[in-house]
Curated annotation (Swiss-Prot):
UniProt-recorded name of the protein: Acetyl-coenzyme A carboxylase carboxyl transferase subunit beta, chloroplastic
Pathway assigned in UniProt: Lipid metabolism; malonyl-CoA biosynthesis; malonyl-CoA from acetyl-CoA: step 1/1
Its EC number(s): 2.1.3.15
Keywords from the UniProt entry: ATP-binding, Chloroplast, Fatty acid biosynthesis, Fatty acid metabolism, Lipid biosynthesis, Lipid metabolism, Metal-binding, Nucleotide-binding, Plastid, Transferase, Zinc, Zinc-finger
GO function terms (MF aspect): acetyl-CoA carboxylase activity; ATP binding; carboxyl- or carbamoyltransferase activity; zinc ion binding
Length: 484
């Protein structure tokens, strides 16, 4: 464990280096040379240190003396020895990898080095000068400022290292409300001496989470969703699940897609009570098939990997089937095949346009050849729907659409539409490379590549999908029931 200095020196003299602390820390990239002295640099915090949100300064009139090494390496796994203006000394220990943060009074060897440093020529040469009263009051107020500086450096490091959202940790003018500060200081603002304060991060390293106050996923998951690409937050009321910051398309549940496409109050589900009965008594060492079905049902609230029913799209009656990837990867078993078959037959009898939204990993292996037969069964009723009745079927491919679904009804639409950046394939990249011993070009299985090769008719963004479908139906003589 490396031991380093984290000392605060107080003076009224001329400063050698000025600027915002955040800029100073950003300038010390790993392996980067600086023009500042390799031993130490003095930093002016007077009216120059601002909050993450650009608010008023947290502390004033404190000069920070630290090593000029990279601030991230400086904090990542070190022990710091700190002394305040009241001669109180303590050590701070960080270990990012083990997620440990400790404050301790046991400084032993560090204390000797500290006092030898305090007697150095730098401190002895600092004179009070003429403004002694100002200097004394300046020193008396440094305990609070010193604490805030420690907190500021800690927060700044964690913000850059763990990508903390500034609006999450700093949402007021009072720095004392920050999460890190609450770990260091008690309500009275005094330094705590207890040990083993722990800081934990979530899987995406997007923010710091306190079990009581900052558990966003538990308290606010009904309001916000997090982008799995840039980790930005999106308001759930915007129902298209497209990141406003990076444009990434997030997965949508079948219920969300129905709500996005179907007019409110017009959805009539079909065959909701149909469940799988484990037809081949599939044996698994890890988890029985029935247990997996039960677990998926509890997680998703669905009976199987597809929802079917009828409703109105901008006033136009339609038959709609939406697959849900959350339910065992959207795999197609006997229940999925039967529900889609019944939906197509109903649409044929009622002369309704048909929409099938695909999101699947393919046939369900736990049902063996029965799952493969669903490909032929659905294709058969679609042939009657399209060829005999001359009705209109639109296939919508979302990410991912693979395997037996791609090889059957996914590619049988009169119009085949895909979402932007959707992954569409029969066999996955890994399977192809292991079978053919050839590398699969990057992006060759993306919707944009398939559109260029003529396998798709269009790529339609989610926010335009409903209006595009409405126009396509009207072009094929399917009109709203009530015209205003």
């Amino acid at each position: 464990m490396e031991k380093s200095w984290f000392n605060f020196m107080f003076s009224k003299g001329e400063l050698e280096y000025r600027g915002e602390l955040s800029k100073a820390m950003d300038s010390f990239a790993p392996g980067e040379k600086t023009t500042i002295s390799q031993d130490r640099f003095i930093y002016d915090m007077d009216k120059n240190f601002y909050g993450w949100g650009g608010r008023s300064s947290y502390s004033n009139n404190v000069d920070l003396l630290v090593s000029s090494k990279d601030i991230r390496n400086f904090i990542s796994d070190n022990t710091f020895f700190v002394r305040d203006s009241n001669k109180n000394s303590y050590s701070i220990y960080f270990d990012i990898k083990k997620k440990i943060f400790e404050i301790d009074n046991d400084f032993s060897d560090l204390e000797k080095f500290f006092y030898s440093y305090c007697s150095s020529s730098y401190l002895n040469n600092r004179s009070k000068g003429d403004n002694d009263l100002h200097y004394d009051s300046y020193i008396k107020n440094t305990k609070y400022n010193c604490t805030n500086h420690i907190n500021s450096c800690i927060d700044s490091y964690f913000r850059s290292y763990i990508c903390i959202d500034s609006n999450f940790l700093s949402d007021s003018n009072n720095y004392n409300e920050s999460y890190i500060y609450n770990f260091i200081c008690s309500e009275s603002g005094k330094i705590r001496e207890s040990k083993n304060y722990k800081i934990r991060t979530n899987r995406n390293r997007s923010n710091l989470i306190s079990s009581k106050d900052f558990d966003i996923t538990q308290n606010y998951n009904q309001l916000w969703i997090q982008c799995d690409n840039c980790y930005g937050l999106m308001y759930k009321k915007v129902k298209i699940n497209v990141c406003e910051q990076c444009g990434h398309y997030l997965k949508m549940s079948s219920s969300e897609r129905i709500e996005l496409s179907i007019d409110p109050g017009t959805w009539n589900p079909m065959d909701e009570d149909m469940v799988s009965a484990d037809p081949i008594k599939f044996h698994s060492k890890e988890e029985p098939y029935k247990n997996r079905i039960d677990s998926a049902q509890k997680t998703t609230g669905l009976t199987d990997a597809v929802q079917t029913g009828t409703g109105q799209l901008n006033g136009i009656p339609v038959a709609l089937g939406v697959m849900d990837f959350r339910f065992m990867g959207g795999s197609m078993g006997s229940v999925v095949g039967e529900k889609i078959t019944r939906l197509v037959e109903y649409a044929t009898n009622q002369c309704l346009p048909l929409i099938l939204v695909c999101s699947s990993g393919g046939a369900r292996m736990q049902e063996g050849s029965l799952s493969l037969m669903q490909m032929a069964k659905i294709s058969s009723v679609l042939c009657d729907y399209q060829s005999s009745k001359k009705l209109f079927y639109i296939s919508i491919l979302t990410s991912p659409t693979t395997g037996g679904v791609t090889a059957s009804f996914g590619m049988l639409g009169d119009i085949i539409i895909a979402e932007p950046y959707a992954y569409i394939a029969f066999a996955g990249k890994r399977v192809i490379e292991q079978t053919l011993k050839k590398a699969v070009p990057e992006g060759s299985q993306a919707a944009e590549s398939l559109l260029r090769k003529g396998l798709l008719d269009a790529i339609v963004p989610r926010n335009l999908l409903k209006s595009v479908l409405s126009e396509l139906f009207q072009l094929h003589a399917f009109f709203p029931l009530n015209k205003n």
